[in-house]
């Protein structure tokens, strides 16, 4: 009897100690799996979702959107014939008759090489034009690598070389560096050197600067340097561009309102001459009618317009140009026919 009671007491004591040990169980040590912490994984995913910066283009293209839709007027009668002699060579014949400038015949030639860098780009490109006075303008554009492009321009007057310019554009992943050297005179110690840099800060914002250095005996003080700041903000079909320097500033605004309408506003201010000009321009495209119209109005009350109409099914294009200056009470009209 005593043994039975003793064994029963021992069993109850064992169960009590079991419940106590279960209530005082120590926490298990965390096991390291060797993986990346979840916070770091989320941060890496958020970084991967950020849009990659792209090349912002060159500083020369900063205000091109607004400039391209402005009316490029001409005066008098003009006939232009474009003829392709091969897949790489094309010639242009132009006859211009007007009272404002030299009338006569112009000849142009274009050669496009076989080095393909894109569906619409091939290099080298050779351009040449001879005006009615016998002056020659020649340009060479070549893509040396996928990122480096060089341009060379020269001008001949009276069988003499009067102007040269060499430009190199290096397009990085998110920046563009441009170096330009104009009219270098190694014997006369004169010339112009320009350095331009444009950097994509965000997907919409690009900032940069331009440094221009001009030296020579005809320059006041024999040398002058100018530093300017540039910026561009683009979102959707809207682009704001600005150039700010000690001589003035240049501000432009461009918006593509629809597939048929583009609008641009431009303000140029020269602080030294205390002059400022504002221009409002627009372009209307009517693809079904094969018609394009560009018009502009500036603060000097100069109204300009150019109408271009393709005459289908013939390879002809008709251009009508008009320019009216209210301050000078003058009107200029031009009519042109382009074949080819």
Swiss-Prot record:
InterPro entries: Porin_dom_sf (IPR023614), Porin_Euk/Tom40 (IPR027246), Tom40 (IPR037930). The keyword Ribosomal protein does not apply. It holds the Pfam family Porin_3. GO terms for biological process: monoatomic ion transport; protein import into mitochondrial matrix; protein targeting to mitochondrion. Its main location: mitochondrion. GO terms for molecular function: porin activity; protein transmembrane transporter activity. It is a multi-pass membrane protein. Only expressed in the male germline, detected in primary spermatocytes as well as post-meiotic stages. Not detected in stem cells and spermatogonia near the tip of the testis. Keywords: Ion transport, Membrane, Mitochondrion, Mitochondrion outer membrane, Porin, Protein transport, Transmembrane, Transmembrane beta strand, Transport. Channel-forming protein essential for import of protein precursors into mitochondria. Belongs to the Tom40 family. This is Mitochondrial import receptor subunit TOM40 homolog 2. It comes from Drosophila melanogaster.
């Amino acid at each position: 009897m005593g043994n039975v009671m003793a064994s029963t007491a021992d069993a109850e004591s064992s169960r009590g100690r079991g419940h106590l040990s279960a209530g005082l169980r120590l926490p298990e040590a965390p096991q390291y799996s060797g993986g990346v912490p979840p916070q770091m994984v989320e941060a890496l995913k958020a970084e991967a979702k950020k849009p990659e910066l792209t090349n912002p283009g060159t500083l020369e293209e900063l205000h091109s959107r607004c400039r391209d839709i402005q009316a490029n007027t001409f005066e008098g009668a003009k006939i232009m014939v474009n003829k392709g002699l091969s897949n790489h060579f094309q010639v242009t014949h132009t006859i211009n008759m007007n009272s404002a400038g030299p009338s006569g015949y112009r000849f142009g030639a274009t050669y496009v090489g076989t080095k393909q860098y894109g569906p619409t780009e091939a290099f080298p490109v050779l351009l040449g034009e001879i005006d009615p006075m016998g002056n020659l303008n020649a340009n060479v554009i070549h893509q040396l690598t996928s990122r480096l492009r060089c341009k060379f321009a020269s001008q001949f007057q009276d069988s003499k070389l009067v102007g040269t310019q060499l430009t190199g554009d290096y397009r990085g992943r998110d920046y563009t560096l441009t170096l330009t050297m104009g009219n270098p005179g190694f014997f006369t110690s004169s010339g112009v050197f320009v350095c331009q840099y444009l950097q994509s800060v965000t997907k919409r914002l690009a900032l940069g600067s331009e440094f221009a250095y001009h030296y020579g005996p005809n320059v006041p003080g024999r040398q002058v340097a100018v530093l300017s700041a540039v910026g561009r903000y683009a979102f959707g079909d809207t682009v704001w561009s600005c150039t700010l320097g000690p001589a003035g500033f240049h501000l432009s605004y461009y918006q593509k309102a629809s597939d048929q309408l583009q609008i641009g506003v431009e303000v140029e201010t020269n602080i030294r001459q205390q002059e400022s000009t504002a221009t409002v321009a627009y372009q209307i495209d009517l693809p079904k009618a094969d018609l394009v119209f560009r018009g502009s109005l500036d603060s000097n009350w100069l109204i300009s317009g150019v109408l271009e109409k393709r005459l289908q099914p013939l390879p002809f294009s008709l251009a009508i140009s008009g320019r009216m200056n209210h301050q000078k009470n003058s009107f200029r009209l031009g009519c042109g026919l382009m074949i080819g």
